[in-house]
């Protein structure tokens, strides 16, 4: 077994106090996202999306956040993917944003709701053409005999859609994750980290400090 117990560091970038918190957690999330982008972090919109299968086995993968507002967090994916199939059976999910250089993380619990075709199409048309074509190529989560199969399919579809717009695949969609709770974590000295959780009760958010 590889021993990693000596790998540690102190957290000293500042704390998080109750007086710092807005009543709406999305306002704090927007501030932290802006600061993550301003700090030029690598992939600040990357989030871990966790789902479970019919046996309760959890699965995680990194997905890019594409939009957020007071209603929740939006991402897009292949509807034949493992995550989409698991969401169809159980739409309870969690999201995690790891902003390590800022000594921050945000954890979200909520339910995923499928977006309308109009909403998906609006985003799909903003993607680079090669990315649109790639959406047609991959049967996400299916087994491949070799990478060449995937690349061959890509060039085949690229020739097919050489002229004009790339249509939206019927098997490509998106989700809005409506949060029921959002936790903000800020690293603190001596491992006395600051954690605050917002829990939704009807239309209001209740705020509590959690022990680190």
Curated annotation (Swiss-Prot):
GO molecular function: FMN binding; pyridoxamine phosphate oxidase activity
NCBIfam families: pdxH, PRK05679.1
UniProt record similarity statement: Belongs to the pyridoxamine 5'-phosphate oxidase family.
UniProt-recorded name of the protein: Pyridoxine/pyridoxamine 5'-phosphate oxidase
GO biological process, one term: pyridoxine biosynthetic process
HAMAP family assigned to the protein according to its UniProt record, in alphabetical order: PdxH
Reaction equations catalysed: pyridoxamine 5'-phosphate + O2 + H2O = pyridoxal 5'-phosphate + H2O2 + NH4(+); pyridoxine 5'-phosphate + O2 = pyridoxal 5'-phosphate + H2O2
EC number(s) on file: 1.4.3.5
Source organism per UniProt: Shewanella baltica (strain OS223)
Positions with a binding annotation for substrate: 8-11, 66, 123, 127, 131, 191-193
Note accompanying the cofactor annotation: Binds 1 FMN per subunit.
Subunit relationships: Homodimer.
Enzyme class, first EC level, given as a word: oxidoreductase
Residues annotated as binding FMN: 61-66, 76-77, 82-83, 105, 140-141, 185, 195
Cofactor: FMN
Superkingdom of origin: Bacteria
InterPro entries registered for this protein in UniProt: Pyridox_Oxase, Pyridox_Oxase_CS, Pyridox_Oxase_N, Pyridoxamine_oxidase_dimer_C, Split_barrel_FMN-bd
Role played: Catalyzes the oxidation of either pyridoxine 5'-phosphate (PNP) or pyridoxamine 5'-phosphate (PMP) into pyridoxal 5'-phosphate (PLP).
Pathway, per record: Cofactor metabolism; pyridoxal 5'-phosphate salvage; pyridoxal 5'-phosphate from pyridoxamine 5'-phosphate: step 1/1; Cofactor metabolism; pyridoxal 5'-phosphate salvage; pyridoxal 5'-phosphate from pyridoxine 5'-phosphate: step 1/1
Keyword Protein biosynthesis on entry: no
Keywords noted in UniProt: Flavoprotein, FMN, Oxidoreductase, Pyridoxine biosynthesis
């Amino acid at each position: 077994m590889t021993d990693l117990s000596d790998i540690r560091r102190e957290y000293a970038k500042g704390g998080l106090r109750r007086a710092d918190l807005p009543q709406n957690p999305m306002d704090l999330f927007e501030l932290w996202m802006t600061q993550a982008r301003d700090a030029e972090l690598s992939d600040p919109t990357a989030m871990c999306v966790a789902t479970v299968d019919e046996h309760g086995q959890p699965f995680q993968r990194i997905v890019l956040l594409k939009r957020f507002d007071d209603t929740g967090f939006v991402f897009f994916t292949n509807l034949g993917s493992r995550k989409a199939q698991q969401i169809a059976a159980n739409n309870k999910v969690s999201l995690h944003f790891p902003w390590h250089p800022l000594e921050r993380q945000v954890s979200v619990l909520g339910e995923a709701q499928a977006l309308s075709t109009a909403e998906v199409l609006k985003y799909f048309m903003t993607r680079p053409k090669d990315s649109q074509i790639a959406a047609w190529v991959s049967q996400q989560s299916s087994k491949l005999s070799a990478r060449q199969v995937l690349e061959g399919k890509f060039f085949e579809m690229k020739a097919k859609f050489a002229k004009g717009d790339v249509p939206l695949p019927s098997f490509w969609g998106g989700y809005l994750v409506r949060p029921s709770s959002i936790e903000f974590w800020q690293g603190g000295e001596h491992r006395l980290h600051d954690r605050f959780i917002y829990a939704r009760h009807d239309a209001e958010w209740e705020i509590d400090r959690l022990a680190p």
